[in-house]
Amino acid sequence: HQAEHSDLIAAQHNVSDQIKVQDTELFLDNLFTEEEEPELDIYTEGWDSQNVNCYRNAVVPQTKEINVSKFAMPCPGYMTSPYGYRRRFRRMHKGVDLKVQIGDTIRAAFDGKVRLTKFERRGYGYYVVIRHTNELETVYGHLSKFLVEPDQYVKAGDPIALGGNTGRSTGPHLHFETRFMGYAINPSAIFDFENQTTHTDTYTFDKRTYENAR
């Protein structure tokens, strides 16, 4: 009986340890990826009469090599929330969140032309969309102030806005997206946010990877 009792206690400890590990993994996953509800997608929600996604009916190539050698980091802050599906909200987070303080300078990631500077109360708050010469578009959300206007040309590194906490946001941060013909590319596939650089000088877009991210 003593041996059986010892085995039972050991088994209970094992189950308890497994639950603790699973709970810890779930907690960390939720802490890192689900701390904030993803923004309603300005490219698909249809609220913008100016057609934020002007590529809706365009034929998108299966693959495309994109030159990202001439770049600037949008801000020096670290990543607080990655790109990816949010189980709790059943919605994609189609960009990354980067730590900023209100008033921090936000910079254009590549050369290009400002397409939109708008306000969207349900998600992005004050945001900027830039169409770049390398055919990417970038989106910068939750801003506090615009430093550029639509149709203005900018160079990589030019100040475009100040960081903020507008729209659906629980604290100051920059929501940053990279898009190709309407498809939301994982910014971390292009940028190494930890080391403040790009992974390579050329990024290869593969349509199959992002079929659910348009």
For the regions a language model picked out, list residue spans one by one.
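Acidic, glycine-rich catalytic/binding loops that coordinate metals and/or anionic ligands
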Residues: 149, 177-214
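A structural signal for short beta-strand/turn segments enriched in small hydrophobics and glycine
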Residues: 106, 112-114, 151-163
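Active-site loop architecture of trypsin-fold serine endopeptidases
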Residues: 122, 163-175
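Zn2+-dependent peptidoglycan hydrolase active-site motif and core
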Residues: 91-94, 108-147
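Short glycine/threonine/proline-enriched tight-turn/helix- or strand-capping micro-motif at secondary-structure
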Residues: 56-63, 78-107
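Short hydrophobic beta/alpha edge segments that flank linear recognition/processing sites
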Residues: 98, 126-130, 155-167
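A residue-level detector for short acidic-glycine micro-motifs
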Residues: 81, 100, 116, 142-145, ...
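Polar/charged, compositionally biased leader and regulatory segments
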Residues: 1-82, 198-214
